Amino acid sequence: MADESNTGPVAAAEAVAETQAPAGKRKSSSRRQRTAAGQVAESKTTAKPKRYSETERADKLNLIEAEVAQGNSTLKDAIKSAGISEQTYYVWKKSAKPADRKPEESVVAGDDLADLIQLDKENLRLRNLLSDKLRAENAELRKRLGLD
C-alpha cells in the first residue's frame, strides 16, 4: 500500500503523457476534417466548360466582326458582349476554316500585272533621271570648288 500512495513523479509524467497524446490526435483529426471540407468546396466550384459547335463559333465571330465594323464598340467590348473570352476569340479566329473566311482577291492578277510592269518601267526611268541630275550637280560643284 505504501507504493500506491507514493506515486509522485511517475504519476505526474503519465498524466502529462495522457494529456498530450489526445491533444495530438485531436489536431491531426481536425486537419483531416479541414482538408476534406476544402476538397468538397473545391469540387463544387469547378464548372464544366461549354462547348460551341462550328456554326455557333462562326456566328459569334461574325457578330463580333459586325459590331467592330459598324463602330458600335471596340473589339474587347464586342468579345465580352458575345460572352466569350479574348483568348477564345483569337483561338477560334485562328482555327476558322479557310472556306469560312471571305475569299481575298489576289494582288497580282490580269490587269494588275500589266499595271505593275508599267510602274516598274516608270520607276526605272525616274531613277535614271535622278542619277543624271545628281551627276550634273556634282560636276558643277566640283568646277566651283576647283577640284577638277
Curated annotation (Swiss-Prot):
Q: Name one Pfam family in it.
A: HTH_Tnp_1
The answer to whether the entry has keyword Lipoprotein is no
Q: What UniProt keywords apply to this chain's record, in alphabetical order?
A: Nodulation, Plasmid, Repressor, Transcription, Transcription regulation
Question: Which InterPro entries did the record assign?
Answer: Homeodomain-like_sf, Transposase_8
Q: Which SUPFAM superfamilies match?
A: Homeodomain-like (SSF46689)
Q: Where is there biased composition of kind Basic residues?
A: 24-34
Low complexity: bias regions: 7-23
Molecular-function annotations in GO: DNA binding; transposase activity
* Stretches of the chain forming a coiled coil according to its record: none
Q: What is this protein called?
A: Probable transcriptional regulator SyrB
Question: Which source organism does the UniProt entry give?
Answer: Sinorhizobium fredii (strain NBRC 101917 / NGR234)
| Native organism taxonomy | Bacteria, Pseudomonadati, Pseudomonadota, Alphaproteobacteria, Hyphomicrobiales
Originating gene? syrB
